[in-house]
Every structure is written in C-alpha cells, then in structure tokens.
Amino acid sequence: MASQWTIPKLVTWRVRDWASCFLACKIPLDGDEDGANNNGNTTNNNNLTFKRIKRKIKSTKKKRSERKLSLSPPGTRHHHLHLRSSSVSPTTSGSQHRRLSWPQPPVSEESGFIVFCFDREDGGFDVVKEGKQEKKETESSSEKSPRTVNRKLIYGDQGVGGTEKNNSPETKGTEQDQNDNTSCQGTKDVSSDVTERTKEEEDIDASDKSSGSSHSDEGRGSFAFPILGVEWMGSPAKMPESDDLSPKKQKPVALGFQCCRF
C-alpha cells in the first residue's frame, strides 16, 4: 500500500542517484569532512586533558618539594635552594646576561680621588687629595701643587694612633725646638743624677774614714778594731763606742779583754 510519504521519498532517492552520477565525489567528501571535524575536536580535547594532567603533576611535585624543604633540617635547606637556583632555565639566564651587558653610564672624570704614597723611610705615608676645585686651581696657576699630608703611625700602650703633620717650615721649626728642649732636659737630669751620686759616695767615704771599722763577713773567724788596737777572734756581742774619733783628742784607755773562741 502506498502512503502519502512514498512519493517524496522516491523523488529524493532519485535526486541523490542523479547527483551521484555527476558529482560522485561530493557526497563522500561531505562525510569525510564531518569525520575530520570530529577527529579534530577529539584531538583538541585530548590535548587539553593532557595539558591539565601535566599541570596537576607539576603542582603536586612543587607541593612535595615544599613539604620536604619544610621538614628538612636548616642545614640542608641552603643546599636545596642552591640546586634550585642552579636549575634555572636558560631563557632567564640569557635575559639576566642581557641586562648585565647593557651599556652602563660612564664614570665622570671630574670626580675627586685620593693617592696614598708608601715610599717613605720614616714609616709614615703621604696622602694626596685632589678634587674639582684643586684641578681648577692647578689649571689656573701651574705653580701651585696639590695638598700633601703626612700621617705617621705611633704605636703606644693604649693602641695605634695617627698624628697628622703638615710639611711646612713652621712645624719643622717647632719640632726642632721641642727636640732641643727635651735633649737639654735629659742632659740636666743626667748631670743632676751624677752629682747626687758623687755626693753620696763622698759622704760614705767620710763616714768610713771616721769610723775606721772594717766590716768582715760571717764566714771569717776574726775582725779588728783599729781604734782600740785590739783584734778579736769570733764575733763580739756588742760593738765598743768611742767618745771622740779625732786623733788629737784621743786619750790612752787601758782595758782588759778576754779572748773568746766559739
């Protein structure tokens, strides 16, 4: 039985067959394009999923490394950070190299400078300071020379100190005067010491001559009293005393002593 839809179906089939005769590649090409589009969509989806998986893996690795660093002792953290810094991508290192290789501004030639001269035999050193103003002065007057400062190191008990001395005739004259004064004071002190020593020696000689007693050592067995003209053996308990030591006023004294031997 024929229905109302059979006629249009037959018409459509006949049109397709007729078109397929003239355009044999048209229909399969449409089908291939649809398949290629489907395949492209699937590949894009696969790429997106693969990228997402990569990102997740990287994030998990970073989290694990951070946990290890937090749990590791402080001595090893520096080592891990050094390894991370060494494993920087070459692109970043190239950019840093480019930044470093940029042309730097030239140093101004008008800036001042200091020159140290250590060729002195006194142990000191000269300091030459030159700046913009001094350069202008030297250009204006060639006779003027840069300021020189002599600094001499003095090593004392408390520490090391530096004394600044300007090379001028006034300072040299004052230094010579000070040295002369110190030398004069030293000679005066030495002469006074010598005179005091000679006076002490003269006093000792006078006392020895007046007493006339010769002090013997303990190891010897006898000693003498020249005033009394008596020689004892051993050491007496008490020294005899004489009233007048002058030879004119001496009176003959007769005393009897007993010799004692120990």
UniProtKB/Swiss-Prot annotation:
InterPro entries: BASL. Residues 222-262 are annotated as: Required for polarization at the cell cortex. Changing residue 145 to D: In BASL_123456D; phosphomimetic, increased interaction with YDA and promoted polarization. The keyword Zinc-finger does not apply. Cortical localization of BASL requires phosphorylation mediated by MPK3 and MPK6. Phosphorylation promotes YDA binding. Phosphorylation status modulates subcellular mobility. It is a peripheral membrane protein. Residues 179-189 have a biased composition (Polar residues). Changing residue 235 to D: In BASL_123456D; phosphomimetic, increased interaction with YDA and promoted polarization. Transmembrane segments: none annotated. Changing residue 246 to D: In BASL_123456D; phosphomimetic, increased interaction with YDA and promoted polarization. Residues 37-47, 84-95 have a biased composition (Low complexity). Mostly expressed in stomatal lineage cells including asymmetrically dividing meristemoid mother cells (MMCs) and meristemoids, and, at lower levels, in their sisters. Also present in vasculature. Expressed at low levels in the epidermal pavement cells. The modification Phosphoserine is found at residues 72, 85-87, 89, 145, 168, 235, 246. A motif (Nuclear localization signal 1) lies at residues 50-57. Changing residue 89 to A: Reduced ASK7-mediated phosphorylation. Abrogated MPK3/MPK6-mediated phosphorylation and abnormal nuclear retention associated with impaired cortical polar accumulation. Reduced interaction with YDA and fails to induce polarization. Regulates asymmetric cell division (ACD), especially in stomatal-lineage cells, probably by modulating accumulation and subcellular polarization of POLAR and SPCH. Mediates an attenuation of MAPK signaling upon polarization of POLAR and ASK7/BIN2 in stomatal lineage ground cells (SLGCs) undergoing ACD, and relieves BIN2 inhibition of SPCH in the nucleus. When phosphorylated, functions as a scaffold and recruits the MAPKKK YODA, MPK3 and MPK6 to spatially reorganize the MAPK signaling pathway at the cortex of cells undergoing ACD. Component of a complex made of POLAR, BASL, ASK7/BIN2 and ASK3/SK12. Interacts with POLAR, ASK7/BIN2 and ASK3/SK12. Binds to YDA when phosphorylated. Interacts with MPK6, MPK3 and MKK5. This is Protein BREAKING OF ASYMMETRY IN THE STOMATAL LINEAGE. It comes from Arabidopsis thaliana. The lineage of its organism: Eukaryota, Viridiplantae, Streptophyta, Embryophyta, Tracheophyta. The gene is BASL.
